[in-house]
Amino acid sequence: MIRVGINGYGTIGRRVANAVSSQDDMIVVGIVKTKPDYISEVASRRFKIFVPDSSYMKAFQDAGIKVEGTLDNLLDDAEIIVDATPEGMGEKNKPLYIKKKAKAIFEGGEEPDVAETSFNAYSNYNDAIGKSYVRVVSCNTTGLARTLYPIQQAFGVKHVEATLIRRATDQNDSSKGPINAVEPSLKIPSHHAPDLKTVMGNIDVNTVAIKVPTTLMHVHVVQVDTEKNASNDGVLEAWNNYRRIIHVKKDDGIKSTAQIMDLAREFGRDRSDLYEIAIWEGSVSAKANRISYIQAVHQESDVIPENVDAIRAMFNLADKEKSIEKTDKSLGIEKRVY
């Protein structure tokens, strides 16, 4: 059993902790929290709580939450840390991981050079085998890589144009916006294009990102110029081989991200998460060598399976197909069309 520590127990960290706990080849040995809030109180019923350093202990003690020790203490026990701290903190934490000889996974908010390789389970699993420091790419980049990889394998990819309509913030964050505005990223391509190249090779891609006042999901409008001609049925068949992609249909009442997230609730998933990338089947248009489609990305959870697979790759516990199968089975990910 690989002993996993979680540094940062926010949107991603708490979901990774639950996912790791669902595996039969790894275990959570502790989580790091900075505040004795309601999240810490609930988490303490299930996980050992650690703090960044001793200066945080009194606040937890005053709140009646037991603290096992500091991050340094957790690193004495953990073989690997999943660093889900806020953007930029992973780079600052890395020297401690190196000092304690612990492997580490970083999330997409960190720069690529924080790790030996960036990671997506479908597109470059093998690059992470045996590595000590791996970065799981962002929710948006994961969403693009998930659906572009099958197209690349089936038809080849010449060029990708993607418009990313991004949610403003996560549902539990009341401090960010916009609230009543549309906020474009004026840098073109947005950072997602070079990020995609870290897991899909030197793919020719351009991305535009626009932030809108919603918290549910991101939506991507994607156009792909392919090397081989494609048909609608051929594209759908290519995606059918991958469980982490689902097809949804307007005719079944799924017109918006609201219905997609309601569908996730009906799955009975932990936190109503949708690990899969949802593609509106009616949006798929393949004419000669151009494929167009629209997809929705649940930004809180689509990277969670990748974190589990990255752990297996780094410890060479399983090959790509076996790891993905184990992760999907444990999280209830199965091929679905709605």
Swiss-Prot record:
- Its annotated pathway? Carbohydrate degradation; glycolysis; pyruvate from D-glyceraldehyde 3-phosphate: step 1/5
Q: Which reaction does it catalyse?
A: D-glyceraldehyde 3-phosphate + phosphate + NADP(+) = (2R)-3-phospho-glyceroyl phosphate + NADPH + H(+); D-glyceraldehyde 3-phosphate + phosphate + NAD(+) = (2R)-3-phospho-glyceroyl phosphate + NADH + H(+)
Output the GO biological process annotations, alphabetical, semicolon-separated: glycolytic process; lysine biosynthetic process via diaminopimelate
EC number(s) in its UniProt entry? 1.2.1.59
Summarize subunit and interaction data from the UniProt record for this chain: Homotetramer.
HAMAP family recorded: G3P_dehdrog_arch
Quote the protein name from its UniProt record. Glyceraldehyde-3-phosphate dehydrogenase
Instruction: Specify the species.
Output: Thermoplasma volcanium (strain ATCC 51530 / DSM 4299 / JCM 9571 / NBRC 15438 / GSS1)
